[in-house]
A protein has these predicted regions:
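Iron-sulfur cluster-binding electron-transfer modules in prokaryotic oxidoreductases
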Residues: 1-173
Length: 173
């Protein structure tokens, strides 16, 4: 992924202090603890005035859901910030979390992406697996503003000349 981003001219900076999102498992046991963990990562990015780019659909979903919860509830954001202040952090809510697929479609564009291909993949069939976190809940993922996100992997596959094969597990957890 880093090579793809570099080829597309996108500079990346690793957030050394970022932790794993908890993959939704932590949130099932203790949602506030999971949200503190994820908003902490967003606060690090916010301090650097950077968005979060992820290739993991679970990370995308978990961070986006945590961000959505604090942005729609200022009192909850204050609770989270009271925990973050112990580390000298505060989250104001300006960090955008974007999956690499969304960057390819929304920021680069499929036409520009196609210009970077060395070979077309005609004759190949791929069965895309999104998982559940990158497609649900849609209100936390910006689908109303960007409806193409629901089909982003299909769109990237088709742009290579390959064909998409649907299967029932495409968006299952």
């Amino acid at each position: 992924s880093l090579l793809v981003l570099d080829k597309l001219g996108i500079e990346t900076i690793e957030l050394d202090k970022a932790a794993c999102t908890g993959a939704g498992v932590l949130q099932e046991k203790n949602q506030k603890l999971g949200d503190v963990l994820n908003i902490r990562t967003l606060a690090f990015a916010e301090d650097m005035n950077l968005p979060i780019i992820t290739i993991c659909s679970t990370c995308q979903g978990v961070m986006s859901q945590a961000n959505h919860r604090v942005l729609k509830n200022p009192e909850y954001l204050e609770e989270i910030n009271s925990e973050l202040r112990e580390e000298g952090l505060e989250y104001k809510g300006s960090t955008e979390v974007k999956h690499l697929l969304w960057i390819l479609i929304e920021d680069i564009g499929l036409n520009e992406l196609q210009k970077t291909f060395k070979k077309e993949l005609k004759g190949f069939n791929f069965a895309p697996f999104y998982g559940c976190y990158i497609v649900r809940p849609s209100d936390a993922l910006g689908f109303s503003e960007n409806p193409e996100r629901q089909h982003s992997l299909d769109m990237v596959i088709n742009s290579t000349g390959a064909s998409v094969t649907d299967f029932s597990g495409k968006t299952k957890c």
